Regions:
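Amphipathic alpha-helical repeat scaffolds
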Residues: 172-176, 220, 259, 287
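Residue at a conserved register position within TPR or TPR-like alpha-solenoid repeats
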Residues: 116, 120-123, 178, 215, ...
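TPR repeat positional signature
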Residues: 108-109, 113-116, 171, 210, ...
Length: 410
């Protein structure tokens, strides 16, 4: 049966009295079926035509209900900018109620903040298409940050009913907004507050989905700052805690975890690449080149995928993977020399020429070998006078992951 506005108000009131957060979230969601039902009751709803409903239920819920109708109306008329403004006002009204209540309100908070972010995305996209400039996502991020403060400052609720149980979900949403508008540095303020807060539950006690989102963005922040050890740690935890059916989220994490593992010499299996064909298209050529020690193939893969790698912020990381490829090439030289401990530099020079570095001089080849020794990819030293590479009798080519701080020296 279609819902009229009086029934809508009654159901909101019932949800409030029962402290039913999930139902309240459902009632405030613009995509819920009753949104279209309510519009049938009003031809062209405006704040003034709906003003007489103020006082119908306790404040601020009378105004929130009116805002909801206005939001649905703007969405139906494909006006995302106006819908975003009304949703922002709805969130502000909700905050007045939220800060005076306990954690049962969190499902509704999460829902209206998600809708705010989605409408901000739609509004910015719509403006861009029409050659206009808007910063709705930036405004959304500021609003979400206010929600974070409202969650953190709950001092009165019992621990199991605290608004603090919303902290990591809200932080994850704020980080999504900041990453979307490329204002990543703003995430550091929130992380600093979390790190300095001793009165919130440990991360592992929060819902797993909250943990995964937070660790993913923490890993991404470390990745972009070239703090590769911490990035690998956080992304690994995010991946192994990610729901097995959340295939897209797993792929999103692996897009950055795989190159970090490659830099340590841990190449992805064929089975993993089969499960994620989009990632296989990006990484398989690099993996094949590293296994073959084929520098030319590695360079071709970089060139062909340059635009995509720049878009994903992966170009610099995979450029560093050349050293893994060079290690593979030099190891093949060592194998061709029957694993000898004394190999002329000329052999490494010849291998580089064959691999596509056609203009390289012997002196440059010597420098490349010296660099591989310095970074721990090879064990030995160079006799410059005799133009000879003297390799260790045992473990001349250690596994990349066995090098001291294998990511720190990249």
């Amino acid at each position: 049966m279609p819902m009229d506005f009086s029934t809508f108000l009654t159901q909101i009131n019932d949800a409030l009295n029962a402290e039913n957060g999930p139902n309240l979230a459902y009632l405030l969601r613009p995509t819920s079926p009753h949104g279209k039902d309510l519009l049938k009751s009003f031809r062209s709803p405006t704040a003034s035509t709906l003003a007489h409903f103020k006082g119908s239920i306790t404040s601020p819920w009378d105004e929130i209900a009116i805002q909801y109708v206005l939001i649905c109306s703007h969405i139906a008329r494909l006006r995302p900018g106006e819908a975003f403004k009304e949703q922002s006002q709805l969130v502000s009204l909700f905050f007045r109620f939220f800060i005076e209540n306990r954690g049962w309100t969190l499902p509704a908070l999460f829902s209206i903040l998600r809708d705010l972010r989605d409408l901000a995305h739609d509004a910015d996209w719509h403006a861009k298409v029409h050659n206009q400039n808007t910063e709705c996502m930036v405004e959304a991020a500021r609003t979400v940050a206010k929600a974070f403060s409202s969650c953190m400052t709950d001092r009165l609720s019992p621990p199991d009913e605290s608004r603090k149980w919303g902290v990591y979900y809200v932080v994850g949403l704020a980080m999504k907004c900041y990453f979307k508008v490329k204002r990543i540095s703003l995430t550091k303020n929130i992380i600093k507050v979390l790190d300095n807060s001793s009165d919130i539950p440990a991360l592992e006690f929060y819902p797993r989905s909250h943990q995964v989102t937070y660790r993913y963005y923490l890993g991404m922040l470390s990745f972009l700052n070239e703090e590769y050890e911490k990035a690998e740690q956080e992304l690994t935890l995010a991946f192994y805690h990610c729901h097995i059916q959340a295939h897209d989220n797993q792929a999103r994490i692996l897009a950055y975890l795989i190159p970090l593992r490659i830099l340590k010499g841990h190449l992805p299996s064929d089975e993993l690449m089969y499960r994620f064909p989009v990632l296989a298209d990006i990484f398989s050529p690099f993996v094949a080149a590293i296994r073959a020690g084929d520098l030319a193939a590695y360079e071709r893969a970089l060139e062909l995928r340059e635009a995509r790698l720049i878009e994903l912020n992966l170009l610099l990381t995979l450029e560093k993977g050349r050293e893994l490829c060079m290690r593979g090439l030099f190891r093949r030289v060592w194998l061709a020399a029957d694993k000898g401990t004394r190999i002329p530099i000329s052999m490494f020079h010849a291998a580089l020429l064959i691999s596509g570095m056609k203009d390289i001089e012997v002196e440059e080849a010597e420098c490349l070998v010296a660099n591989m020794v310095y970074k721990g990819f090879m064990r030995g030293y160079i006799s410059h006078e005799k133009q000879m590479v003297v390799l260790a009798a045992n473990n001349a080519f250690p596994r990349p992951a066995e090098r001291p701080a294998p990511l720190a020296s990249l």
